[in-house]
Every structure is written in C-alpha cells, then in structure tokens.
Curated annotation (Swiss-Prot):
Family affiliation: Belongs to the peptidase S1 family.
Oligomeric and partner information: Heavy chain (catalytic) and a light chain linked by two disulfide bonds. Forms a heterodimer with SERPINA5.
Purpose: Acrosin is the major protease of mammalian spermatozoa. It is a serine protease of trypsin-like cleavage specificity, it is synthesized in a zymogen form, proacrosin and stored in the acrosome.
Organism: Ovis aries (Sheep)
Keyword Protease belongs to the record: yes
BP GO annotations: acrosome reaction; activation of adenylate cyclase activity; proteolysis; single fertilization
Regulation: Inhibited by SERPINA5.
Taxonomic classification: Eukaryota, Metazoa, Chordata, Craniata, Vertebrata
Protein's recorded name: Acrosin
Disulfide bonds: 22-152, 26-160, 71-87, 175-244, 207-223, 234-264
Length: 329
C-alpha cells in the first residue's frame, strides 16, 4: 500500500504553461500516419512528430566521432528521460552516450551534427535501478538526466505516466509500441525510420502459462503482442515506450518500457515490458514528484492479473542479447 501523502504529492497537473520548457500537455501526438497499414516487426513508418517523447539513445565512439542508435527512451520533462536498465550493461559512462530528440529517421554510424528541428544532447547522469538483475531482467528500468535541457516544440514533447490510483493497465486493450529496432529477428542493423505498431495487452496469467513464458513473468511486467506473434518489438527497441490511450484526456500514457523477449514476433512469445505504474514511487524519488506528468487510466480488473507471480529467479528469460556492441566498430 502506497502512503497517502505520496499519492497527494504525486497528483501532478498536466495543464500547460510553457510548452518550450516541456511543462505543457503530455502524451499529445502532433501527427499521425493515416494509412493504417501494417514493419518495429510487422509495423509501419511513423509520421514525423507522431510520438514526440521518443528519444534515440546513441553510443558515441570517440575515435571516429560517430553515433550509433542502440536503445529508445521516453522524454519525461526537459531534463529527464526513462529507459531500460539493460541498455547500460556495458556502456555505463555518461560520456559514452548521445541523445537525439525529435527524430523520425536516424542514420547508423553518422558523424554529422543534427539539424533542426532535431536536437542532440549530452548525458549528465545515469540512474539504474538499485535492484536491477541482468540475469532475470528484474527491475529493468533506468533514468537519464539530459544536459543541457531539451527544448520542447512541434516534434518534441513529454510523455505521460499513469497515476498511482490508475493501477496496472487494463486488459484487454490495444496500445502502441514504437522504435528504431530490427525489422526482422535476424537483421544486423536497426531501422533507419521510426516504426510504430498496434499491440494488444495480454493477460499476465496467460503470458505466464506453461506454453507461453512458463513462470518467467513478474507482477511488475506487462505483456503485449499477439498469440500468433508476427508483430513485436525487437533488438534496438529496448527502453522505448509501450503506450496506451487515455480516452478522457485524449493523451497517450507510457505504461511500459520495452525490456525483453524470446526472439522477436514469435508465437506465444510476446514482448515483455517493465510496468511504469510499478515504479512510479522509484521514479519520483529520483527526479522529484513535480517533475513527472501523470494521467489517470482505467483500472485493471482483479481477474486480469492472476498467475503474475514474481519469478523465483531460478528460471531466466532468454533475453534479447546486447547485439549492438558487436556491431559498432
């Protein structure tokens, strides 16, 4: 049970004052792809500005001044973004990273400066969850402090987080994923174009069942995809958002962080995400309660989470490997 005082402190307004400082409305899509077709795997190119809180996390190599996209992230405000802890298994120094905001297309291994409306920023601090486990992917969540602060505008804006009282995301519902990851499981490079795809939230009991993930799913996870596979996040999408629409506010809420999976787009092996709702207290403790935008979401029914037990730790997920460090030369 979360303290009442924390709940009151974290009842954060989403009313705009100055959008350039990222204090404006959160979760607002500036543009949408109206084609509705369906490559993420099984997705489509996203329109520029469709997901303005999307951030490209790029490894910076000093010997040739080149940048390589390796993970995604979600902008929370002008100074902080949310991503996955496993993105930092090898590269943990702030000087190893560059952040690109407002992008639709990212170029692999470029040494060219970005041009407006894109913005490039450095990293001041990386905060990895204290109980993150690389073997089980428990607590796969991290924060990055941006320097200098990013300026929000037409293609850049903050994402929303769920409020405490929202509870876990409601199942069933159709949500969205986005990223620059692989377009097929055996690809060798990430997609240059931002991809988006609709995915269904999957009951954790089903996701944790014998023929699915067989006890590997934790109560702090969200599963999303389809029983037959075919549409999924993949390598390079890690750290990016799983987003559900709040119909009352007409905003999108980041309910999950792309974490792990067995292969990509396989049947009965949907994407596994870190539930942001489970870590709201942790996020607020690191960046301050007034620094996050929150939106109420429909509460999950009690029947939607049976079988979502914390893993014993003896069963380890076949986590998508840190492929990107082998590809960068």
């Amino acid at each position: 049970m979360l303290p009442t005082a924390v709940l009151l402190v974290l009842a954060v307004s989403v009313v705009a004052r100055d959008n350039t400082t990222c204090d404006g409305p959160c979760g607002v899509r500036f543009r949408q792809n109206r084609q509705g077709g369906v490559r993420i795997i099984g997705g489509q190119d996203a329109a520029h500005g469709a997901w303005p809180w999307m951030v490209s996390l790029q490894i910076f190599t000093y010997h040739n001044n080149r940048r390589y996209h390796v993970c995604g992230g979600s902008l929370l405000n002008s100074q902080w973004l949310l991503t996955a802890a496993h993105c930092f298994r090898i590269k943990k120094k702030v000087t190893d990273w560059r952040l690109i905001f407002g992008a639709k297309e990212v170029e692999w291994g470029t040494n060219k400066p970005v041009k407006p409306p894109l913005q490039e920023r450095y990293v001041e601090k990386i905060i990895i969850h204290e109980k993150y486990s690389a073997s089980s992917e428990a607590n796969d969540i991290a924060l990055m402090k941006i320097t200098p602060p990013v300026t929000c505008g037409h293609f850049i804006g903050p994402g929303c987080l769920p409020q405490f009282r929202a509870g876990p995301p409601r199942v069933p519902q159709t949500c969205w994923v986005a990223g620059w990851g692989f377009l097929q499981e055996n690809a060798r490079r990430t997609s240059p174009m931002l991809q988006e795809a609709r995915v269904d939230l999957i009951d954790l009991g089903l996701c944790n069942s014998t023929r699915w993930y067989n006890g590997r799913i934790r109560s702090t996870n969200v599963c999303a995809g389809y029983p037959e596979g075919k549409i999924d996040t993949c390598q390079g999408d890690s750290g990016g958002p799983l987003m559900c629409k709040d119909s009352a506010e007409n905003s999108y809420v980041v309910v999950g962080i792309t974490s792990w999976g067995v292969g990509c787009a396989r049947a009965k092996r949907p994407g596994v995400y870190t539930s942001t709702w489970s870590y709201l207290n942790w996020i607020a403790s690191k960046i301050g309660s007034t620094a996050v935008h929150m939106i109420q979401l429909p509460t999950a029914s009690p029947a939607s989470t049976p079988g979502a037990q914390a893993s014993s730790g003896s069963v380890q997920p076949s986590v998508r490997p840190p492929w990107f460090f082998q590809q960068i030369t």
